[in-house]
Each structure stands twice: as structure tokens, then as C-alpha cells.
Design a protein with these regions (language model features):
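Receiver (REC) domain active-site loop signature in two-component systems and cognate sites
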Residues: 59
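C-terminal output helix
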Residues: 110-120
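Charged docking surfaces used in two-component/phosphorelay signaling
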Residues: 19-27
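Short hydrophobic/Thr-rich beta-strand motif most characteristic of the beta2 strand and flanking loop
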Residues: 29-36, 44
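Active-site beta3 strand of CheY-like receiver
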Residues: 48-54
Length: 125
């Protein structure tokens, strides 16, 4: 019996990037869940318990940093690895992401397959 495909939750308010990530993760064998803002991302994460989350930082309603802090503070979702994806590339931005509890930080623009490699590395830990 083949192992179950990992499930990734992609949280991104830009529909073009959301679709790009959906297609690439799907092509690499992931089950893909989608959310268009941080509030929806938190709800989907709690309901579906994905294996990993990739989230933008700057989003309406709830930011990616708030999403990370909320999910890492919840015993039911604290162990889910989270990758922050952002156009913010200053060292202070990276520090804020790590301080919030993110497991990795990828800056835009990015190569989708490089991001997927980093996600796979997190899943293999």
C-alpha cells in the first residue's frame, strides 16, 4: 500500500499565486487545500489538520504572522509545520516570522519547485 499523499494548506490572497501554488503542489502529488485569507486559513487548518501550511504574510482580516501565532498556540495545530511566503525580505521580517513560530520563510519572487523542496524537507523531519 502506497503512503498517503501529504496535504498542504495554501493561504494566499493573490488569486494568481494561489492558483500557481495549487497547480504545482498538485503536480508534485500533494492533496491541496486553499484559503484566501488568514481567517479562512485558521478555520481550514483546524477543521482539516493539513500536514503542512504555506501562507502569505500580508493578507486581509488576519495576517500570516497572526495565523502562525494562533495555530502554534493551539495544541491541536501546534505541530503543523508552517512556511511563510512573503515579498518582505528584510532580516527583521524573517526574525518576526521565526519569533511567531514559523518553521521556514520564503521570499517572493520564488521558484515553485524550490518551495516544494523546502516543504518536503519539513515533512521529512
Amino acid at each position: 500500500m502506497a503512503p498517503a499523499a501529504p496535504t498542504v494548506l495554501v493561504v494566499e490572497d493573490d488569486p494568481v499565486i494561489l492558483r500557481l501554488l495549487e497547480v504545482n503542489f498538485d503536480l508534485e502529488g500533494f492533496n491541496v487545500l486553499l484559503a484566501q485569507d488568514g481567517e479562512e486559513g485558521i478555520a481550514v487548518a483546524r477543521a482539516k489538520r493539513p500536514d503542512v501550511i504555506v501562507t502569505d504574510i500580508m493578507m486581509p482580516k488576519v495576517s500570516g504572522l497572526e495565523l502562525v501565532e494562533t495555530l502554534k498556540a493551539d495544541a491541536d495545530t501546534a505541530s503543523i509545520p508552517i512556511v511563510l511566503l512573503s515579498a518582505k525580505a528584510q532580516s527583521g521580517d524573517l526574525r518576526a516570522g521565526v519569533d511567531a513560530g514559523a518553521d521556514d520563510y520564503v521570499t517572493k519572487p520564488f521558484e515553485p519547485l524550490d518551495l516544494i523542496d523546502r516543504v518536503n524537507a519539513l515533512l521529512s523531519r
